[in-house]
């Protein structure tokens, strides 16, 4: 006892001495600093201690402490032998106690502290603790657990256990966690019949033993071991989750027909994806950190939702083809693969796997999916819009001028007739026959194409056959109105083709595929679209085979597009103005010819095919009853509802009252535009600023004539405007040309039939009964010179003697254009 007290005092003295030494050193530093501070402070001379006073006090205290330490040291030397022997004995006893306390053997006291979750036993007869958690206790021997038969969940992770035979005595065990131990094998015990989850990760297991007795096992984790081959799992018919990460597996096998939903094989040495063909229930697959270079082997897994292939050797975009048909794939991770270096990687993968919601741990935005689709497989409408945009932008390369196809009247667009239909359905033959019969109205417009001519086709007759380089150059120069692709060839409608036909005062008749129709609908042209489609596909297929011009694949593709045309016509009412069955070309041409006659007004009955919707009720526009009516009962059938609505709105604008200043401004604008269209504008453009009366009638006000003599006089007043410097008949004299133009205004005016509206109040009535008798009108009409075209005579005999005429600006420019009313897009 005395020895221990002396040692304690010696220790305290030593510490005190060290503290004193530190305090002495600190005192010296403080003294030195105080001296330095006191030297310049001459303003405070009083109250300062001398330099030797502090040294005397500190030295006295130091001497006392050193003396006491020496006394304690001398006493300690006497008892040194006895103290060393006692310390050795005490240390040995302490080590023995520690060994007895941490021997790795589990005892009941520790078990009692680790039990939790009180519940009903497996037999249901008593209340017991169901869970035991002994994680991180450095346990080696857990044999005491043999008596705990009611356990259902056992956690022995992070210990040093080498034997788990005690688990054989736990028939109700459901979950076992034996991770991070020293196990070299597992399931070397009698299997609990209800064991569902087992975790043996991070042990020293080198092979998988036979688990055929573990029928109820649903989750098995064997991460971080030394397993080289998957085996022994064939009879685990309830196994859903299998994890073998961080092992030495090189080949995937031994998983035949197991109901595995989650499979983790990351951080192994796998080079090929094999052995997964029979895992039909697979939903989550982790093959990250391997050496896989191909995705082959992942096909036909319809339930696969998540694929993790991070840090592998996938390098080609074409590998995505193997997983593009997985219907519910949502998450894909290809980080740290060579494929990411591809410039098109992101949008290509999104396009191929449109159902993805997450790629490379990033959420995919809707805008990215739309951009990917528009880049690799744009919808037909997007293709048409891009084509139209391309040609509009490239058109600035051409000289800017007013096109010959630009008509001066808003309600009379340049007339075009488009025959659309599948390949070799007869639309080209119908177009040629139509242009031959109606040669004074239509001319065939040949498209440009990069394909070689078929047998019997002529260059510039059926198509303009050009090379791909020439075609691309024309696109870049902005010479096309539209282009489209069919098969492996390009087709395009040249601007010069349409303008050349319009320059001769004729309408264009063109045939094309549906792709060209879509692009043309984005332009400002408003043609009539007629669908020519064979309804009998077998007959159509036989016709293509007999021609001997197409391969089997081309024939099958052409026949398959018949349904496409029919579907478009059904899903988009009004997309085509008329549908003609092309099974019999003779019958089809008869119907087409009759339809064109009705369009041109060459028959007594107007075309009723355009009045498919109900007539618009405009009771406020109905005129009063009169023997010579202004409105025919069939006029509503002739005009489509869209046209009637346009006429109503247009008539409302024309009928609006305008101030004199507005009228003068409109007169000047229309006069300048008309002179420009006729090529009479002067270089200095001073005509735009001239003032004065406009000699031709304009749209600022409608004038109604009482007799044909008055109308004839009005033409004489503006005779100068009927003499354009160029025209379709340059060989005629000026007088004959003027007469023919006057007559053509009666015959080919789009509104030569009775108008569906009433003249405003106060205007002069245009019916002949109010100003002259029918006999006088007949004599006046016969006095007019008539052209000697037989079809015009037949058409003129069916017309009424009273012709209400609206003089439109520019109606005297191209009087030979056929009166095809405005279509709808």
Swiss-Prot record:
- Protein location: Cytoplasmic vesicle, Secretory vesicle, Acrosome; Cytoplasm, Cytoskeleton; Cytoplasm, Cytoskeleton, Cilium basal body
Any GO BP: axoneme assembly
In its UniProt record, a GO molecular function of this protein is:
ATP binding
The gene name on file is LRGUK
| Protein name per UniProt | Leucine-rich repeat and guanylate kinase domain-containing protein
SMART domains, A to Z: GuKc (SM00072), LRR_SD22 (SM00365)
Q: What does this protein do?
A: Involved in multiple aspects of sperm assembly including acrosome attachment, shaping of the sperm head and in the early aspects of axoneme development. Not essential for primary cilium biogenesis.
Compositional bias (Polar residues): 763-774
Alphabetical UniProt keywords: ATP-binding, Cell projection, Cytoplasm, Cytoplasmic vesicle, Cytoskeleton, Differentiation, Kinase, Leucine-rich repeat, Nucleotide-binding, Repeat, Spermatogenesis, Transferase
Domain annotation LRRCT: ranges: 337-375
Per UniProt, subunit arrangement is:
Interacts (via guanylate kinase-like domain) with RIMBP3 (via coiled-coil region). Interacts (via guanylate kinase-like domain) with HOOK2. Interacts (via LRRCT domain) with KLC3. Interacts with HOOK1 and HOOK3.
What species is this protein from? Homo sapiens
User: Where do the LRR repeat units fall?
Assistant: 129-149, 150-171, 172-193, 194-215, 216-237, 238-259, 260-280, 281-302, 303-324
